[in-house]
Design a protein with these regions (language model features):
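N-terminal glycine-/lysine-enriched basic segments
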Residues: 1-188
Length: 189
């Protein structure tokens, strides 16, 4: 005997369960969206409470009892994880967008229709963003940095100063520090 299979799902039943997992994860993560997003309270591995607005942290904490639903949630978690690896932020937005795309696919849209819809949407979003964009300067840099740190003013000022130091074409990267010390290091080159 090659192995024991405990649970098999096929066809529409499997599709419904996978999408149910996607819906559950989206509901948990989307509540944190944007500057007015809500905080989520959850347990860490030791059972201690954690309060966060970070989408990927919320996503990673979700484990669904039903293994097929959990597969759906895991698909969506990957979108959040990839976003945090590539961009460092925007995980909640990526989760909401990935949910919308998966919902279109779930509702029997053809692959071509889904692909064309995404392409059309990307063009429209880029055009819209270009039409409303304004240069970020002065105190706006401090405000944006502070918002991105969940309103930690001290850390926001530190990040804003780092961006001012490197200028428009410079790059700011963040790494965990040893000993929990927050500092800015400028590397030329």
């Amino acid at each position: 005997m090659d192995g024991i299979v405990k649970n098999l799902s096929f066809g529409n039943e499997a599709k419904q369960k996978v999408f149910k997992g996607i819906e559950k994860l989206t509901k948990a993560v989307s509540s944190t969206l944007g500057a007015s997003g809500k905080c989520v309270i959850m347990e860490d591995n030791s059972g201690n409470p954690i309060i966060t607005k970070d989408g990927v942290t919320v996503a990673n904490s979700v484990i669904l009892r039903d293994p097929v639903e959990n597969m759906g949630a895991t698909l969506l978690k990957e979108a959040a994880r990839k976003t945090v690896r590539e961009a460092g932020d925007g995980t909640t937005t990526a989760t909401v967008l990935a949910h919308s795309i998966m919902k279109a696919a779930y509702n029997d849209s053809s692959d071509r229709d889904t692909r064309n819809g995404i392409s059309s949407g990307v063009i429209k979003v880029l055009e819209y963003l270009k039409s409303i964009s304004i240069p970020v300067e002065g105190k706006m840099i401090d405000d944006i940095a502070t918002i991105s740190t969940n309103n930690d003013k001290k850390l926001g000022v530190l990040i804003a100063d780092a961006f001012r130091s490197v200028g428009e074409t410079g790059v700011v990267t963040m790494e965990p520090s040893e000993g929990g010390i927050t500092e800015v290091e400028i590397v030329e080159g």
